[in-house]
Amino acid sequence: MIPVLLVTICLAVFPFQGSSIILESGNINDYEIVYPKKVNVLPTGAMNSAHPCCDPVTCQPKQGEHCISGPCCRNCKFLNSGTICKRARGDNLHDYCTGISSDCPRNPYKGKYDPMKWPAAAKGSVLM
């Protein structure tokens, strides 16, 4: 029997449980949750209701889906490249989704050299 570590997001339905659990894979239909000196059996279908993007057994995105959560993930898909995921503040510029990740990478540019706002400024010039 190989224990499988499940990530908390798939089990958000069960707030009384710890930050992670181990699923004993002897009989996967029983969904046995193994704790030290204690075994609980979840009701049938309980794992399936946790998150619409998440495979209830592997806690990975379901087949055909890109992501489970994150600032650049909506309805189980990555947001388009160039979508603002963090608004500008002070001297910092907007941060944009890449279209290939659910993370929101930090924009390395400052001021008028933001390549999403001023693409002409970045063409053929050296940015310092």
Swiss-Prot record:
PROSITE patterns: DISINTEGRIN_1, DISINTEGRIN_2
Note: Negative results: does not inhibit alpha-1/beta-1 (ITGA1/ITGB1), alpha-2/beta-1 (ITGA2/ITGB1) and alpha-6/beta-1 (ITGA6/ITGB1) integrins.
Family: Belongs to the disintegrin family. Dimeric disintegrin subfamily.
Protein keywords: Cell adhesion impairing toxin, Disulfide bond, Hemostasis impairing toxin, Platelet aggregation inhibiting toxin, Secreted, Signal, Toxin
Subcellular location: Secreted
Function per UniProt: Poor inhibitor of platelet aggregation. The disintegrin inhibits the adhesion of cells expressing the RGD-dependent integrin alpha-5/beta-1 (ITGA5/ITGB1) to immobilized fibronectin. Inhibition on alpha-2b/beta-3 (ITGA2B/ITGB3) is low.
Species assigned in the record: Echis ocellatus (Ocellated saw-scaled viper)
Assembly, per entry: Heterodimer with EO5B; disulfide-linked.
Family annotation (Pfam families): Disintegrin (PF00200)
Name of the protein: Disintegrin EO4A
Signal sequence coordinates: 1-20
Disulfide bonds: C53-C76, C67-C73, C72-C97, C85-C104
Gene Ontology CC: extracellular region
